[in-house]
A protein has these predicted regions:
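Extracellular repeat-rich scaffold modules on cell surfaces
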Residues: 1-20, 83-84, 151-167
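Outer-membrane translocation/initiation segment of Type V secreted surface proteins
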Residues: 90, 94-177
Length: 177
């Protein structure tokens, strides 16, 4: 896929390569390898899982992951290995009241995982995304941003209210994103 978007909601028996200018989406199954080489992969139709019966690799490009406040998220599940060599995870969060310090599994590879993403970004103002890895998974963690409310202040009164909210927020059990 070198231009446009391929959406797989059923099954596709083929190796798929996504390059610059191309995108792959859907909640279907790829019977074959998936290689993202500078393009975009966006599992789900809204939130969903893309299954790869084979190996998954990503070199550069963007992995768009939707998450919601119910703890659900897009995910790539590979029955083979996953090899990550840079690229960016772009978190697209729906509105809602998120649990602080929620972990989402965004990649699972039965055959093992090697490498890391180069960065992660998010559309959430008050939660900071980070990534962690184990032998088979990539995890996305959304944590309370430090001085989140005060950082948006433009006046001394706004800053005072923001500081009060930042002081209270570490003990809060939920957070509005």
């Amino acid at each position: 896929v070198s231009g446009g978007v391929l959406v797989v909601n059923g099954s596709l028996t083929s190796n798929v390569t996504v390059t610059n200018g191309g995108a792959l989406g859907g909640s279907g199954a790829l019977i074959g390898a998936l290689a993202v080489n500078g393009g975009t992969v966006a599992p789900g139709n809204s939130i969903g899982t893309m299954t790869v019966t084979g190996n998954f690799s990503q070199t550069g490009g963007v992995y768009q992951v939707e998450v919601n406040s119910a703890g659900q998220n897009d995910k790539i599940v590979a029955t083979g290995t996953a090899t990550i060599n840079g690229g960016t995870v772009q978190v697209l969060a729906t509105s809602g009241s998120y649990q602080r310090n929620t972990t989402y599994t965004i990649v699972t590879a039965t055959g093992g995982l090697t490498g890391t993403y180069g960065g992660v970004s998010s559309n959430l103002a008050f939660l900071t995304p980070s990534l962690s890895y184990d032998a088979n998974n990539v995890y996305l963690l959304l944590e309370q941003a430090a001085s989140a409310f005060a950082s948006g202040a433009q006046t001394s009164n706004q800053r005072a209210v923001g500081n009060a909210l930042d002081t209270a927020s570490p003990t809060a059990t939920r957070h509005v994103a």
